[in-house]
């Protein structure tokens, strides 16, 4: 099938676009998924759908609270965080009977709403009495990438006077550079860690407290109670750090699926609670469609099938390029969401694609050369708004023309001229167009990718909701740290031992 020219598939089927595109309505806006510039055909799609015919039960099981995270014996209920009935109740519409899990979600959303109101009114003050208006999120992985990406993507909706910063790296430079930009008297720090024992997060929180002590001249307990908020499921551990304001996390929500919860507190404070709710509503709309539609009408399944097809035909990576400055960090968010979810042992042998990417049109002047003429097989995914959030029509037209030119150029190539001037074409692209970047459409796109990841995991026989690979590096890092601090005397490979020796020489 890979020998078939994509452009010939268009020539032989006038209805190809209709058959291989899906449109998802999100309130007044929409998202358009175009899989037609791939090698997919209806026959290929139907072949995969036949293998997925029992996935409906698995999908219902997730929404119903079955323990589909089988390695940890946990429910997978990030969908409950944006449950339609929960959101209706938060807005004061009706009083549905919620199950225990969704009742906890509702209670926490109301708690977030109240805190945002206190923040807006100036009732959240620091040790000097100044209103806190600078939000600093301290977390790593899912406690950082999701909120960081959303705050960046929704910059157009950010509220005047509210600033957001993110600290994740254990390299102290990350924290120090943030402190160089902020007024510590007006800064609120949100420490996000489910266990509240994540090394990078806790050490960064401790460094932030130490720097605040120096700058504000107050003791740590007062600083912690006034300038810090925790998001965690381990209240006892939070208490050891004198942080009194605690928001909940639950075992049924994994970090990379958690931005819809109090993990997204930085989002709610930055864009306001109403816009945070709009984000959740967009995701909720996709949840409804995903659960209701099966087979060819399920956009997430078709998206998964495209990736499965190329994975089984020798592709090992996917390049995501967003032609939208606001979406610059989207591929980084998906990098974790996809690779941590499906980059593990598989019953079928295959695992998820390597995810990388960048920002259009910048990337056209960096790595697109390889995409057009390189020997590596790359599945390219392009995202683009149909309406911009600015009034400069000329510039948006240039963005659109570049995005469409790349997808067409990768497909048709150029056969004339010398070998150096020739482009073989027949390179697949998936194009995702959204009518306009709003909280709803962003939420809908994130939910779409979450569900696509789930479908891929089901097909490969992977539990997409645990992350055992994270623990090995942590264990070895602890051993090396003990050696550095003269608390251990382990034998290492010659390479590691030599680098440790060099480190010792530099410290003398």
Swiss-Prot record:
GO cellular component terms, A-Z: cytosol
Residues holding D-glucose 6-phosphate: 142-143, 193-198, 336, 340, 365, 474
Pathway: Carbohydrate degradation; glycolysis; D-glyceraldehyde 3-phosphate and glycerone phosphate from D-glucose: step 2/4
Positions annotated as active site in the UniProt record: 340, 365, 474
Cellular localization per UniProt: Cytoplasm, Cytosol
Coiled coil residues, start to end: none
Keywords, alphabetical: Cytoplasm, Gluconeogenesis, Glycolysis, Isomerase
Gene3D superfamilies in UniProt: 1.10.1390.10, Glucose-6-phosphate isomerase like protein, domain 1 (3.40.50.10490)
Reactions this protein catalyses: alpha-D-glucose 6-phosphate = beta-D-fructose 6-phosphate
Molecular function via GO: carbohydrate derivative binding; glucose-6-phosphate isomerase activity; monosaccharide binding
EC number: 5.3.1.9
Biological processes, Gene Ontology terms: gluconeogenesis; glucose 6-phosphate metabolic process; glycolytic process
HAMAP family: G6P_isomerase (MF_00473)
Similarity-based family: Belongs to the GPI family.
PANTHER family to which the protein is assigned, alphabetical: GLUCOSE-6-PHOSPHATE ISOMERASE
Oligomeric and partner information: Homodimer.
Functional summary from the UniProt entry: In the cytoplasm, catalyzes the conversion of glucose-6-phosphate to fructose-6-phosphate, the second step in glycolysis, and the reverse reaction during gluconeogenesis.
The protein, known as: Probable glucose-6-phosphate isomerase
Biological classification of the source: Eukaryota, Fungi, Fungi incertae sedis, Microsporidia, Unikaryonidae
